[in-house]
C-alpha cells in the first residue's frame, strides 16, 4: 500500500513541479514549502531563520548523456500492442537525421506533454549483459526527493539508479529494481531498512512488471521507509543520503515475451528496446538552510545565494571573518547563522579555536589575527606593549591606544601601565614618562642612575666631626700641595677610579662615603663596576686628613685592595692617592691603562 502511495505521490510531484506547485508528504518534512515572505531568511523581527530554495525538477532542460540512441544508422523498430491475447506490432523508422523520426536524449528532459509525448529511444535489443545508461549532471549539489521515469516502452526487467556526490568521479547505488535481485545485483530481495543501514540502496521487484507496454512509471523516493526521515534535521546520515550532483540510470535487462529466439526473431528483437518520455529529478538546491534561492555566478555555475553570513556553493562554510562559532546547518528551530569575530574594528582576519569555544560554554571561539592600531589580545581588546589606553576614546577607535613614550634613560623599561600610561621609573626619577628627577634628587651623568640623592654636606669635611688626634703628624703626613701621578704610582696601586662623592655617613670606626664611580681605569682583583658604591675610610684617616676628601667633589682615587665592612665596597687608607679630578686625568689614566696591558707595570 505504501509503495503505491509513494508512486502516486512521485507522479503527482513530477507534473506539479513544472508549474511550481509541489506539496511534500509526511516523509518529506525537510522539503516543506514556505509561504511567500519579504525575506524568507529572516522573520518579522529581522532575526535569521532557516530558508530553503524552491522545489524544482532539477532535470528539466538539462542535457543527458546516453550510451545508446537509435537512428545512427537509421533502423526499424516496432511498437507492440495487445488486443486480447493477440500481440500486434506496428513498425517505424528511427532516423536521427530526420527531426520527425528522431528520438534524441533531449526528449528526456523537455516539457512533458501527455497529449504529445516525445520519447528518447535506445538501439534495439541491447540485452543483458549489455546495458544502457542515462547520465544527468545537476550542476551542483541537490537534495533529491525523488527520481522518476515514464516509459514509452515496457519498463525494464532490471534497472539501477546511482548517484554521485563529486560531479561524476565516483558513484554509489541509490536503488535497484529487479525480479532477480541476487542474480543481477547481488542484493537481497526487499531487505529491511533500519537505522544501521538506512543510507544503503535496496533492491525491490516493484515497478518491474512488463505491463503496461507503454506509459509505465518508475518512481524512487529517497526517504521512503528510512527510519530517520521524520527527524531529518538531526540526521546527518540522511542529509548525506539525499545529496547528489549527478544521477545515473542503468537499464540492465529488457523485458521480453520470450520470442526473441523464434523463427521471426528479427521482428521480435526489433520490438525490444528502452524508450523514456520523461526523466525527472525532484528536489531542491542544497543550501543547508542558509539560502532561499540558487543563482548563476560569474562562471555561469549554479550556486546558492547565501545568507546568514555563510559562503560556498552550498553555503557550507562561514564567510571570512565570521568564525566566532563553528558552521552548522540551519534547522527549523535554529538558523545557526555564522557570527562575526569580535575584534573591536582592529582586525580583518580571525580564526576559530574549538578549545576556547568549549571553555566559553559554546558561545565564542573566534581569535583575531594581526590586530592593528597598536592593539593586541584575542579580541584586539587591549593595547600592545609600549602603548596604553586613551580612556577618552572607545576601544573601537583607531587611536584608542597611545604610545607610552617612556624616557630611554629615566625609565626602567618600555612598557607602561595599560590604564594610566605611567612608565616604570628608575630610583629618583619621576614623571609619567620618567623624564625628570624627583624631589630631593639631582641629575647625574650615569645612564644607570640618572638621578641621585642630593647629599647633605657637612660644614667642611667629614673630619670636622672628629677632633684631629695629637699624633696625626706621626701617623701620616697630609698633602699640602699639588699631588702628582706617574706610571710608577699607578702600577703600585690595585685600583684606579674616577669617583664623585655623594654623601658621607659615620659608621662606628669607619666613615662610609656613597660615591658614584664614573670611570674604572684599573681594578686588579677587586670587582669594581661603574655606578653607585660604598667607599670606606677609617675615622682616624679622615681625622688626619689622610686622605682629604669633600662631598660633592670629584676625585681620582688610587688605592690597594682591602676587605671592606660590607664586602661590596672599596677601601681607602692613608696610603691611598686621592687627587681632585681634572679632565686631563682621563687621558693620562687611559695612557697608563694601555701601558699596563702591554706589561709596562712589571718593568716599573
Swiss-Prot record:
**What subcellular compartments does it reside in?**
Secreted; Cytoplasm
Among SMART domains, the record links this protein to:
C345C (SM00643), EGF_Lam (SM00180), LamNT (SM00136)
Span of the annotated motif Cell attachment site: 530-532
Domain of life, source organism: Eukaryota
Limits of the NTR domain: 472-601
Q: Which keywords does the record carry?
A: Apoptosis, Cytoplasm, Disulfide bond, Glycoprotein, Laminin EGF-like domain, Repeat, Secreted, Signal
**How far does the signal peptide extend, from start to end residue?**
1-24
Q: Please give the InterPro entries that the UniProt record associates with this protein.
A: Galactose-bd-like_sf, Laminin/Netrin_ECM, Laminin_N, LE_dom, LMN_ATRN_NET-like_EGF, Netrin_domain, Netrin_module_non-TIMP, TIMP-like_OB-fold
Chief location of this protein within or outside the cell: secreted
* Domain Laminin N-terminal, first and last residues per copy: 47-284
A Pfam family annotated for this chain is: EGF_laminin
Q: Identify the residues that the record assigns to the Laminin EGF-like domain, covering every copy.
A: 285-340, 341-403, 404-453
| Entry's Gene Ontology BP terms | animal organ morphogenesis; anterior/posterior axon guidance; apoptotic process; axon guidance; axonogenesis; Cdc42 protein signal transduction; cell population proliferation; cell-cell adhesion
Instruction: Name any GO cellular component annotation.
Output: basement membrane
Disulfide pairs here are 119-152, 285-294, 287-304, 306-315, 318-338, 341-350, 343-368, 371-380, 383-401, 404-416, 406-423, 425-434, 437-451, 472-544, 491-601
Q: Which residues are glycosylated?
A: 95, 116, 131, 417
Self-association state and partner proteins as the record states: Binds to its receptors; DCC, UNC5A, UNC5B, UNC5C and probably UNC5D. Binds to its receptor; DSCAM. Interacts with APP.
Q: What does this protein do?
A: Netrins control guidance of CNS commissural axons and peripheral motor axons. Its association with either DCC or some UNC5 receptors will lead to axon attraction or repulsion, respectively. Binding to UNC5C might cause dissociation of UNC5C from polymerized TUBB3 in microtubules and thereby lead to increased microtubule dynamics and axon repulsion. Involved in dorsal root ganglion axon projection towards the spinal cord. It also serves as a survival factor via its association with its receptors which prevent the initiation of apoptosis.
The entry's protein name is Netrin-1
Species: Rattus norvegicus
Instruction: Give the gene name.
Output: Ntn1
